[in-house]
Amino acid sequence: MTDRIARRPHGKQARETYGSPTSHDFAWPHVLEALALGPDDRLLDVGCGGGVFLRHVRQEVGCEIAGVDHSRDMVRLAAPLAVHGRAEALPFRDGEFTAVSCLVAFFFFPDPVLALREMRRVLDPELGRIAIYTTAPEAKGSPAAPYPLATRGHFYSDDELVALPLQAGFRSARIAFREPWAQLLCAQP
């Protein structure tokens, strides 16, 4: 997949990749465990791609779901579950969701602190929590984050990653899961 398509998915190749039932499914168990979703939750998936994770959550958990993606092609693929928008300006009301997920998209966000502030804004202040599954710095240049894609992404050490939600006003943040190629960041408003 080309760098351009990974950063703003569009076209046939992107639809086949991000609309696939196995697209990023390696992250699903970790995110679902961290969020501990129940049928009364309201989940927003930021950078939802083709909506495959959202459909899985709807089937397995039965909670309310919504997604947002900056690629119009991905929003069409995820319809009617997703809307077009940017992580730095989420088109949702304050406190609308009890959980926010972001799977393998965070490292593309140009302003991660602003994106996290927006995630915090749309979270219920009492019940809210986030789970962000992102690519670890050790993966840079590997098949998980090949060049030139690796030069466009933001890779964070565990300490740097945990500091970002705290800068965005979250009260707590931690690395909940770590692999050589991935990190799972969890935070509460």
Describe the function of each predicted region.
Residues 104-107:
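Short catalytic micro-motifs in class I SAM-dependent methyltransferases
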Residues 113-127:
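A short glycine-rich, Lys/Arg-flanked "PGG" loop and its adjoining helix->strand segment in the class I
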Residues 177-189:
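Core SAM-dependent methyltransferase catalytic element
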Residues 1-36, 52-56, 74, 138-140, ...:
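Conserved class I S-adenosyl-L-methionine
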Residues 127-134:
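Conserved beta-strand signature within the Rossmann-like core of class I S-adenosyl-L-methionine
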Residues 153-168:
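Short alpha-helix
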Residues 101:
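A conserved beta-strand element that flanks and buttresses the S-adenosyl-L-methionine
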Residues 44-89:
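Class I SAM-dependent methyltransferase SAM/SAH-binding core
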